[in-house]
Regions:
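ATP/nucleotide-binding catalytic cores
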Residues: 1-213
Length: 213
């Protein structure tokens, strides 16, 4: 799913106004897993220039780490790989792909669905003629296209959310895939704007009346 539109606004999470990634993370952390009705969704969050973070309960993280160790055949554990992901966005997308593969293997025994959230997708996967793209841009487009095209991923329980101001900003080899849907986040209406102003005034000891402070 590509979330477009008003993605850089602040959103009320029930307690405070927070960025969209934080809002989504809190909302999805309260949802039960559709298959188990007990374990929640494991969130994997990638924000540009930051390391990938995995959000879930201890059992979910341990399951994922255990499966990673079996599948990767590497002496480096998942935590070490995650720590390295903030240095290279191409590597980060490759790692997200591998984490989804591990999750599908893990789902044979326990349904720990993943929700992968990727910030600034239009910067990671920019719309441009392939011949004019940098090598790393081309690699990232190829990684995501292969990932989203895998039958096991399309038929599996994991989901990916891409954040971009517009769908057209994401490379067409990704954005035009039939399995990629778009949801536009609208601008706040008058009720939402009033709530924000009232909440801001309350936090800062101010009262707003008829547009005046």
């Amino acid at each position: 799913v590509v979330l477009t539109g008003n993605i850089y606004d602040l959103f009320f999470d029930g307690e405070d106004y927070v960025p969209l990634m934080s809002y989504l993370s809190k909302k999805y952390s309260s949802l039960p897993n559709a298959e188990t009705s007990t374990k929640g969704i494991t969130q994997v969050i990638y924000e540009l220039n930051n390391a990938i973070s995995v959000c879930g309960d201890d059992d979910q993280k341990e399951d994922l780490n255990r499966t990673w160790s079996k599948v990767s055949g590497s002496q480096k554990g998942l935590e070490d790989r995650l720590a390295e992901s903030g240095k290279n966005s191409t590597y980060a997308l490759q790692l997200l792909h591998k984490i989804c593969e591990c999750s599908r293997l893990n789902n044979r025994n326990a349904a720990n669905n993943l929700l992968v959230m990727i910030e600034a997708a239009d910067m990671l996967l920019p719309e441009e003629q392939i011949s004019r793209m940098s090598l790393n841009d081309r690699k990232r487009v190829a990684i995501v296209k292969d990932w989203f095209s895998e039958p096991e991923f399309m038929d599996g329980p994991d989901s990916v959310i891409l954040l971009s101001e517009s769908r057209s900003g994401i490379h067409s080899r990704i954005s035009r895939m039939p399995q990629v849907l778009s949801v536009e986040i609208p601008l706040p209406d008058i009720t939402e704007r009033t709530h924000f102003v009232t909440n801001f005034g309350s936090d800062h000891g101010m009262t707003f009346t008829a547009g005046a402070v």
